[in-house]
């Protein structure tokens, strides 16, 4: 099996490189063909790696970068003022063909700005979009955009729909059902951008557009791809994560209330743990930047070891499915 090589921005995220290094070592154990390049401060990274003496150093290398982009740093400042940041160096490794994907838990705005500057977008795409898998009653739905583009035109929403459809196909969904997130399913509902995007999608050949969808329809699994602007998508994603955590916490509290509830809880514990694992945000961590000339996956800044592993796993799937090339081919067919 040929090697799968990924660059890791080891200095990004809320918790620093320790949990990232742990996630990388766990990913190497799970995937024998995986090779990782950690980008960041060599002395710090080598010290962290040394605490895992069993790791195969032939598959885990370190590339030096002297600067780190802060989580609250403005994208423009990061783009102009930090040419040797771990994030930028990781993206340049991807641009130069030394790795096949880049994963970062760093500043989202800076990652998007640097990705567009270093990698460029695919022909026909104005703006990349962030997409992630959301659990539904019937499986998963690809939701985009998740915050990269707060204000979107109808044309941008149309491009997101095309990219989301291709991504879903790459993940094994035949003729993905594509829907626009809206405040109602009737044609008269929604703002002007959503209505115009619907008109564009209705006329798109080769795209399985099923109309508008409301938030509850998303969770019922009524579409495989749901499209919205980044303002709405980011709120929906974080609300979903918060709701899942709240439900799990409330159920655990109910099972601890008295002796009877504790007995019932003990019987239900295996099922509850399975449900919690299914809905846990860490399991679904990893948002892809679609529309770039390269694979970039954004991990949640607060992701721990398991969450960062999930982001690496998403990058692996996209490498194996040759996603940017597939996108490029389908975009030529679908975009006007």
Curated annotation (Swiss-Prot):
Chemical reaction(s) catalysed: a fatty acyl-[ACP] + phosphate = an acyl phosphate + holo-[ACP]
Single Gene Ontology BP annotation: phospholipid biosynthetic process
Gene Ontology CC annotations of this record: cytoplasm
Transmembrane residue ranges: none
InterPro entries referenced in this protein's UniProt entry, alphabetically: FA_synthesis (IPR003664), Phospholipid_synth_PlsX-like (IPR012281)
Function field: Catalyzes the reversible formation of acyl-phosphate (acyl-PO(4)) from acyl-[acyl-carrier-protein] (acyl-ACP). This enzyme utilizes acyl-ACP as fatty acyl donor, but not acyl-CoA.
Protein name: Phosphate acyltransferase
